[in-house]
């Protein structure tokens, strides 16, 4: 049988030559870029038009930038929206984008990305940028030292004479297993981002998670006992912290994001690509988060629609009625049922930890 002939014109605009295969349609570069930009544009519409919110005054949104391809591409897309908003004299008030970079070298042993931060400021002048070390969580969240001390248990002592960086590193070293370490780091990063957003009086946070990251996060949360947190960790809407969480790239495949990034050379100096997982790493030495990311990455290339359906199914979930106005875990912030309320110390009712956080405690993790 003769092979299927490729179209000589873009299947969208019918003018330019096709350059990409986009969801079974051969499209040109301009249509490819337009299609992907429309995804976050649609999800940012309510902020652009100020629907159900004040029409005057600032509407600040925080974008955490990790220098990864997804968060960098999201920043590029939202900056294009800001350019379009500013070009209209009588257009809607729109929104502001505040970019927060938690310096990667203070989280893991990687070199500082000084040139990337400077290049991001130069490339996206309509956004304001802030860079903070991981240990600045002590300044932004005054209660975190008490929470960490009780969370780590009686064998851990928080030495306040040490620098904030040393105090945080000692606490992180007290966590034993790979899954617990990854889980605790994500909670601390989330607390830092939320605390900074509140300090800057932001209305919400826009996260640069792609469909694969959201699918992996959904599966990992369920495996770690954080299924109740899926409703706000991967879904658009109000979080337990009083801030709106938004995931504008939730309908975009990771492979599409990578291709998009290659079309804009100015992004190359900002993006720090993840190292491919080592084949020699034993499964038992990987965290649940790493296992799920590895699984979704390999299967997502074969079946991208399946991974997208995972996040779409999760977005249909609703918080249980017991979470409304109920107790919140002092560590991760998730709502708890009375059955899973676990106190931080014997007989101490001041701090409560949810079941999932209790599993990651040094004395209980296994």
Curated annotation (Swiss-Prot):
Q: Where in the cell is it found?
A: Cytoplasm
Q: Which GO terms describe its molecular function?
A: nucleotidyltransferase activity; sulfurtransferase activity; tRNA binding
- Keyword Magnesium assigned: no
What SUPFAM superfamilies does this protein's entry cite? Adenine nucleotide alpha hydrolases-like
Look up keyword Cytoplasm and say if it applies: yes
**GO CC field:** cytosol
**Functional pathway:** tRNA modification; 5-methoxycarbonylmethyl-2-thiouridine-tRNA biosynthesis
Alphabetically ordered keywords of this record: Cytoplasm, tRNA processing
Concerning InterPro entries, the annotation shows: CTU2 (IPR019407), Rossmann-like_a/b/a_fold (IPR014729)
Q: Which GO terms describe its biological process?
A: protein urmylation; tRNA thio-modification; tRNA wobble position uridine thiolation; tRNA wobble uridine modification
Q: Name one Pfam family in it.
A: CTU2
Provide the function of this protein: Plays a central role in 2-thiolation of mcm(5)S(2)U at tRNA wobble positions of tRNA(Lys), tRNA(Glu) and tRNA(Gln). May act by forming a heterodimer with ncs6 that ligates sulfur from thiocarboxylated urm1 onto the uridine of tRNAs at wobble position. Prior mcm(5) tRNA modification by the elongator complex is required for 2-thiolation. May also be involved in protein urmylation.
Q: Which family does it belong to?
A: Belongs to the CTU2/NCS2 family.
**Name by which UniProt lists this protein:** Cytoplasmic tRNA 2-thiolation protein 2
Q: What's the encoding gene here?
A: ncs2
């Amino acid at each position: 049988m003769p092979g299927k002939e490729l179209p000589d014109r873009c299947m969208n605009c019918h003018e330019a030559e096709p350059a990409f295969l986009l969801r079974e349609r051969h499209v040109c570069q301009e249509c490819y870029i337009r299609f992907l930009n429309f995804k976050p544009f649609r999800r940012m519409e309510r902020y652009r038009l100020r629907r159900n919110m004040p029409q005057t005054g600032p509407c600040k949104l925080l974008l955490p930038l990790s220098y990864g391809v997804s968060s960098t591409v999201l920043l590029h897309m939202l900056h294009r929206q800001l350019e379009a908003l500013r070009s209209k004299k009588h257009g809607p008030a729109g929104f502001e984008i505040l970019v927060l970079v938690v310096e990667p070298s203070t989280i893991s042993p990687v070199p500082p990305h000084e040139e990337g931060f400077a290049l991001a400021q130069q490339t996206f002048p309509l956004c304001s940028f802030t860079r903070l070390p991981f240990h600045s969580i002590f300044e932004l969240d005054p209660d975190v030292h008490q929470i960490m001390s009780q969370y780590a248990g009686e064998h851990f002592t928080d030495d306040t004479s040490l620098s904030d960086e040393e105090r945080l590193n000692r606490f992180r070293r007290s966590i034993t297993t790979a899954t617990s370490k990854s889980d605790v780091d994500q909670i601390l990063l989330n607390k830092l981002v939320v605390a900074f957003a509140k300090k800057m009086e932001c209305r919400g946070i826009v996260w640069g998670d792609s469909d694969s990251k959201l699918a992996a996060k959904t599966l990992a949360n369920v495996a770690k006992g954080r299924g109740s947190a899926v409703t706000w960790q991967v879904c658009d809407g109000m979080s337990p912290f009083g801030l709106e969480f938004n995931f504008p790239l939730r309908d975009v495949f990771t492979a599409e994001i990578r291709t998009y990034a290659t079309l804009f050379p100015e992004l190359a100096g900002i993006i720090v690509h993840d190292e491919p997982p080592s084949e020699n790493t034993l499964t038992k030495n990987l965290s649940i988060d790493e296992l799920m990311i590895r699984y979704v990455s390999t299967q997502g290339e074969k079946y991208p629609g399946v991974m997208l359906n995972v996040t779409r199914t999760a977005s249909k979930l609703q918080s249980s009625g017991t979470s409304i106005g109920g107790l919140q875990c002092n560590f991760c912030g998730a709502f708890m049922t009375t059955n899973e309320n676990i106190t931080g110390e014997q007989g101490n009712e001041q701090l409560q930890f949810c079941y999932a956080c209790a599993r990651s405690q040094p004395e209980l993790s296994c």
